[in-house]
């Protein structure tokens, strides 16, 4: 069975798929990457049995194109800011830092990667809160990962840690599900977004082969008690 899944699910799906394979006997060949890029590959003819996206929009498009019948929300996440571990970036108010043009802000690539789309939503929130500041941040933020032309992140490295270590940004806006793993990286610090900018995002999956029993079993496992516990243990958030 083949699974296409958002790259932000790799940490959580690695133990989840191992548990599923042990319990069910079904083997899963997983491909991880930017959800928008994976959705385009499906539209162009590739056919995994299951698609798990970091948003609802990409699987909804596949439903609209009759590649799938329904979208199932299965977990949630939120954004955070990872900063270089220096007092100038760890001590001041994060909202102040985001509005300070001296700091370079990195994101993932909008459209190709939902994380980049969520960063754009954050800029929208900031613009409503402080008119002019959201548009200014949007204009100077740089998409550093997740796009077709983005430089690859070395194996075993997290994008936020690598990009900050390579001095490509001072602040990186990405998923909070990486926070525990990033906490082990001394050169960076994870900071939660201020309440006025914080929001949760919903991940959705769809079956692309409704008649494939193993795929049905995988979806049931992800949505079931054991799958949900693994997702939450690995930093994802429960559906509310």
Name each model-derived stretch:
Residues 1-24, 29-31, 36, 40-46, ...:
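Exported/periplasmic ABC-transporter solute-binding proteins
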Residues 66-72:
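Central helical "cap/lid" subdomain
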């Amino acid at each position: 069975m083949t699974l296409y899944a958002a790259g932000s699910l790799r940490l959580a799906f690695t133990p989840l798929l191992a548990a599923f394979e042990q319990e069910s006997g079904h083997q899963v060949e997983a491909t991880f990457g930017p959800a928008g890029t994976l959705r385009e590959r499906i539209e162009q003819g590739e056919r995994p049995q299951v698609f798990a996206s970091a948003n609802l929009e990409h699987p909804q498009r596949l439903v609209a194109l009759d590649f799938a019948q329904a979208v199932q929300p299965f977990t949630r996440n939120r954004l955070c800011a990872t900063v270089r571990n220096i007092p100038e970036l760890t001590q001041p108010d994060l909202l102040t830092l985001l509005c300070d043009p001296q700091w370079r802000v990195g994101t993932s690539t909008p459209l190709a990667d939902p994380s980049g789309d969520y960063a754009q939503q954050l800029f929208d929130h900031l613009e409503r809160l402080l008119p002019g500041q959201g548009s200014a941040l949007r204009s100077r933020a740089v998409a550093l990962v997740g796009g077709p032309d983005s430089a690859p992140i070395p194996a075993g490295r997290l994008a936020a840690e690598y990009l900050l270590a390579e001095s490509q940004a001072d602040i990186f806006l990405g998923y909070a599900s990486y926070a525990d793993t990033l906490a082990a990286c001394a050169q960076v610090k994870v900071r939660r977004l201020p309440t006025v900018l914080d929001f949760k995002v919903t991940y959705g999956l769809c079956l692309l082969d409704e008649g494939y029993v193993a795929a049905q079993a995988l979806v049931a496992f992800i949505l079931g008690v054991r799958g949900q516990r693994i997702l939450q243990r690995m930093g994802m958030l429960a559906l509310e």
